[in-house]
């Protein structure tokens, strides 16, 4: 993964209270208008103490940040190009997802959104 994204993730994690975070994996997701991501937990990593750092690029999206049970109503958090979200500690296993992406065009990425989800997988 490009060093610049590792640096952004490391600095954002430190600012959120997760000093020493060193991502070793990056999940890249591309969304087109109408695409969504259902509520889920990121719990397949060996190290669940390390945070998740999400970098949004392209079209705006609405991030859903729920509770520890899928049935808990999630908060809606608007995300724009360049936004970074960090969650870890007790929030690490909260359900989260993305509302269906609205139509639009971004000057750099066109009709799409790209999300980089950096984490410590191993």
Report residues per predicted region:
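Non-heme Fe(II) oxygenase metal-center motifs and adjacent flexible, charged/small-residue loops
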Residues: 1-122
């Amino acid at each position: 993964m490009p060093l610049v994204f590792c640096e952004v993730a490391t600095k954002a994690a430190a600012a959120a209270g997760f000093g020493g975070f060193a991502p070793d994996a990056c999940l890249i997701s591309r969304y087109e208008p109408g695409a969504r991501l259902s509520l889920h937990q990121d719990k397949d990593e060996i190290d669940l103490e390390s945070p998740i750092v999400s970098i949004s690029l392209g079209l705006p999206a609405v991030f859903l940040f729920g509770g520890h049970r899928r049935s808990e109503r999630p908060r809606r958090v608007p995300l724009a190009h360049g936004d970074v979200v960090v969650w870890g500690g007790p929030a690490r296993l909260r359900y989260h997802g993305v509302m269906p992406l609205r139509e639009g065009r971004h000057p750099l990425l066109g009709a799409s959104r790209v999300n980089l989800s950096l984490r410590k997988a191993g």
